[in-house]
């Protein structure tokens, strides 16, 4: 595993960096070349609706969009020892629209909750996806990324390297317990025919190490990566890259001050299965998160979504929606055991589990709260940033079990709607937000 940082514990008897350095603790020169292997060979989207729903935001607003790919890894038989990432869902974190792109604040508050919800479904982050679309009129989009411009900009390469470092590939065959990353980057942009297309990439392990060592930085020219200068706090080794000149001879040149980003890129193929069998099969999609002004995620929307539920078989179909599951988890009403039951119904489509859920006290309480709160959302979204606020993390079943006796002993009052025991000074119920009287 490449590492271009100065070793901090050198045994040669000199002062530690930056006061001293020797040939044993300083990193060796870097020679850039195309990486000969890929950690992931193919990206498979379980259904085309994933991409259509994702780019609908751009179609509606003209703004770009970012999302995380949740899925799993499977063998890819089309290449020897191949690995493919199967994408089952796209989650869109809070983001702020800009005229020239978008702004992210990562990690966001609910990232851990979303990851736990995905894990309950047997999924985890396998990559990220974002749009880079510009309308050309007549149903076409502008082709901005091609062989004469760039495929992935230097800034995007640094971002991908940081995300790959954050999501390493765990292996027992490495001394550090990890090696490179299977995290992929997908860009939805226009192709040479003016059609919307997906391009998938990874950056090399060399790029990951150079970004971690603070050796490179983005350039104003998107197709060029800049090598930083050495300072008292940062040691930058010699960086070279090789290419064939017009005579077909291999030539080695210094990469300072800059070099082409193609030396850091890896192409990854993508596609859709011939027989689409997605994990989530809800016939009607629930509202997508963090789309203020376009789609709302609140109790009223959820109640309307569940109102059509007729019997356990239909409940199985309605619950089989990743966005629905993550929203329900964000409310904090269900404990881990009950939410795991919801997730199991969503992915296994078991009518027996759905029948058991219908009789579950937690589910019945959840339905009762929704009926009493047609206009009182548990979760509110900020118009500018998509920030969320959730109800207090209190188990509803435990609150019901406390009863009115303990409430009277503390001088509080019990909500006549959900029976939660509130403090005496509370005007509205802390759980269902309804007034005391």
Q: Locations of the language-model features?
A:
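Short HxH-centered metal-ligating active-site micro-motif
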Residues: 1, 18, 92-150
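C-terminal functional modules of predominantly eukaryotic multidomain proteins
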Residues: 1-12, 16-38, 108, 144-168, ...
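Eukaryotic beta-rich interaction modules
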Residues: 2-5, 27-76, 82-113, 411-414
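Beta-strand elements of modular eukaryotic interaction domains
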Residues: 10-13, 54-60, 75-81, 90, ...
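Core residues of folded domains in eukaryotic genome-function proteins
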Residues: 18-21, 62-66, 77, 81-89, ...
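Eukaryotic short linear interaction motifs
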Residues: 29-32, 75-79, 95-101, 126-127, ...
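Eukaryotic assembly scaffold/adaptor repeat-domain signature, activating on surface loops/turns
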Residues: 58-62, 70-75, 120-124, 137, ...
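Amphipathic alpha-helical scaffolding segments
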Residues: 65-67, 72, 83-89, 132-136, ...
């Amino acid at each position: 595993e490449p590492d271009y940082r100065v070793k901090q514990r050198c045994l040669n008897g000199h002062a530690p960096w930056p006061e001293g350095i020797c040939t044993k603790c300083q990193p060796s020169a870097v020679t850039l070349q195309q990486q000969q292997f890929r950690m992931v060979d193919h990206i498979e989207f379980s259904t085309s609706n994933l991409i259509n729903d994702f780019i609908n935001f751009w179609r509606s607003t003209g703004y770009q969009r970012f999302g995380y790919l949740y899925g799993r890894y499977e063998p890819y038989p089309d290449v020897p020892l191949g690995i493919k990432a199967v994408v089952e869902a796209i989650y869109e974190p809070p983001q702020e629209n800009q005229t020239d792109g978008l702004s992210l604040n990562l990690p966001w508050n609910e990232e851990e909750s979303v990851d736990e919800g995905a894990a309950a479904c047997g999924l985890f982050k396998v990559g990220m996806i974002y749009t880079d679309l510009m309308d050309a009129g007549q149903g076409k989009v502008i082709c901005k990324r091609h062989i004469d411009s760039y495929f992935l900009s230097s800034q995007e390469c640094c971002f991908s390297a940081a995300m790959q470092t954050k999501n390493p590939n765990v292996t027992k065959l490495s001394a550090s317990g990890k090696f490179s990353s299977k995290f992929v980057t997908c860009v939805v942009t226009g192709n040479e025919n003016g059609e919307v297309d997906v391009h998938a990439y990874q950056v090399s392990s060399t790029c990951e190490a150079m970004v971690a060592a603070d050796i490179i930085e983005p350039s104003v020219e998107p197709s060029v990566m800049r090598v930083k200068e050495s300072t008292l706090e940062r040691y930058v080794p010699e960086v070279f890259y090789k290419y064939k000149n017009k005579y077909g001879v291999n030539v080695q040149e210094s990469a300072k001050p800059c070099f082409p980003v193609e030396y850091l890129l890896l192409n990854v193929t993508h596609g859709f299965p011939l027989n689409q069998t997605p994990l989530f099969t809800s016939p009607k999609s629930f509202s997508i998160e963090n789309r203020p002004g376009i789609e709302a995620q609140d109790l009223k929307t959820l109640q309307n979504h569940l109102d059509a539920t007729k019997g356990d078989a239909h409940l199985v179909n309605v619950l089989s929606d990743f966005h629905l599951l993550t929203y329900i988890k964000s409310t904090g009403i269900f404990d881990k055991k009950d939410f795991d039951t919801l997730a199991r119904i969503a992915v296994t489509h078991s009518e027996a589990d759905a029948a058991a859920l219908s009789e579950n006290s937690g589910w019945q309480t959840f339905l009762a709260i929704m009926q009493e709160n047609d206009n009182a959302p548990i979760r509110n979204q900020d118009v500018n940033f998509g920030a969320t606020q959730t109800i207090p993390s209190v188990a509803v079943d435990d609150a019901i079990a406390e009863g009115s006796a303990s409430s009277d002993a503390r001088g509080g009052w019990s909500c006549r709607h959900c029976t939660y025991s509130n403090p005496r000074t509370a005007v509205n119920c802390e759980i269902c937000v309804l007034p005391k009287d």
